[in-house]
From Swiss-Prot:
Protein residues bound to ATP: 223, 235
Keywords: ATP-binding, DNA replication, Nucleotide-binding, Plasmid
Name this protein carries in UniProt: ORC1-type DNA replication protein 17
Database matches in SMART domains: AAA, Cdc6_C
Family: Belongs to the CDC6/cdc18 family.
Species this chain originates from: Haloarcula marismortui (strain ATCC 43049 / DSM 3752 / JCM 8966 / VKM B-1809)
Origin superkingdom: Archaea
Length: 402
């Protein structure tokens, strides 16, 4: 193909894309993961919203709130509720004449505490402050000082949402936020809403942080099939009128509910199905488009899960994937066998292996993320042992993990 033909082909592709998203989409952004719908579109989380708001409530009158940690698996509404409650709190505070700073930080995308502070600073920084929050070039203490100065000068209270807080290298940020008022760094009350997929995150906090970061905890359960169907039904105005076949939403909901009720996955699957229909220049989105889109959604979901894992979690996952790949006649592997291959992975990568107990903990964390599954077995001497199985395609894990 010469350059003119290539140019014409590219123009042809772009010409199929309208401002709204082709013939299929009307408002494609409604299916984006970070889209926060209005309250009447939030499904199955009324009780959780009320409880979180109750803990944060005093902030709207400028009083110290209770900080909280929200736990739960991916796609169960944790981030959505945190964002929604902080948004409503800001509006209610404004109605009462209280200037409330609110900011959201995805810690998986932050490169550490300094970057997280920089992102929060930019979110709350009014143009007239004259304070700068560069992406690099200043110390962590300087980022803190600049955040404190903005809060002290322009606000009466503050909320910070730390999504995927377990992805930070340490809990120093929680420690500093919890002690900011006590040590005189800041004159306004600060409420922290931390969000984590890891239910044992608190166990990894230092004793100092546990003592200082007084908080309440909530665990969000996965959505069921009916709730996911309602969530998707509430997002159908992402599509042009009449383009969705009747079976598309029930099928997408059933697929997602079967795999631990992940609403993010359901929306991603529906969005990809619409994209697939657009690529085919189809008039309607059919169930067959869901089938085609599912493979892409699976790869993206797994990549999202493992991209934020620390190196040794990836090493353990690769060990389990290698066992699965090399022993197609077996599904389950004992901890000691996984550890043997883990040691080989560490040797190849030049990493110092962790202890056997820590290896077991990392396997259990993979189970919590539903990358792996576990079961208990009984040996000849009536002793118990654990076995693990990979819940994803081994070839995909090996490709993405490396």
């Amino acid at each position: 193909m010469d350059s003119d033909d290539e140019s014409e082909a590219v123009h042809s592709v772009f010409n199929t894309v309208s401002q709204e998203g082709g013939k299929i989409f009307e408002q494609r952004e409604i299916l984006q993961i970070d889209y926060v719908p209005s309250e009447n579109r939030i499904v199955g989380r009324d009780e959780q919203i009320e409880k979180v708001a109750g803990e944060i409530g005093p902030i709207v009158v400028g009083q110290p709130p209770n900080s909280i940690i929200i736990y739960g698996k991916t796609g169960c509404g944790k981030s959505l509720v945190a964002k929604h409650v902080s948004k409503i709190a800001r509006e209610e505070a404004e109605n009462r004449g209280v200037k409330l700073a609110t900011g959201y930080v995805n810690c998986q995308q932050a490169k550490g505490n300094s970057d997280a502070l920089s992102k929060y600073g930019r979110a709350i920084n009014p143009p007239e402050s004259g304070v700068k929050f560069p992406t690099r070039g200043i110390s962590e203490n300087e980022y803190f000082e600049r955040v404190w100065s903005v809060l002290n000068e322009f606000y009466d209270a503050a909320i910070i949402v730390l999504d995927e807080v377990d992805k930070l290298n340490n809990d120093d940020l929680l420690m500093a936020l919890s002690r900011a008022g006590e040590d005189g760094s800041v004159d306004v009350p600060i409420g922290v809403i931390a969000v984590s997929n890891k239910i044992n995150y608190r166990d990894k906090m230092s004793e100092r942080t546990k003592s200082s970061f007084g908080h309440n905890e909530f665990i969000f359960e996965p959505y069921d099939a009916d709730q996911i169907r309602e969530i998707l039904q509430n997002r159908t105005d992402a599509f042009a009128d009449g383009v969705l076949d009747d079976g598309v939403i029930p099928r997408a909901a059933a697929l997602s509910a079967k795999e631990h009720g992940d609403a993010r996955k359901a929306m991603r699957l529906l969005r990809y199905a619409g994209d697939q229909a657009n690529k085919e220049n189809a008039e309607r989105v059919k169930e067959s488009h869901l089938t085609d889109a599912r493979a892409s959604a699976e790869v993206d979901r797994l990549l999202e899960l493992i991209s934020g894992l620390p190196p040794h979690s990836k090493h353990v996952l690769l060990a389990l994937a290698n066992l699965t790949k090399n022993h197609p006649d077996r599904e389950w592997f004992r901890t000691v066998r996984v550890r043997e291959i883990y040691l080989e992975v560490c040797d190849r990568s030049g990493a110092d292996p962790l202890s056997a107990e820590r290896t077991r903990q990392l396997l259990n964390e993979l189970c919590f993320l539903e990358v792996a599954g576990s079961r208990r077995g009984t040996g000849e001497g009536k002793g118990h042992y654990s076995q693990y199985t990979l819940l994803w395609d081994a070839d995909i894990v090996l490709t993405l993990g490396n």
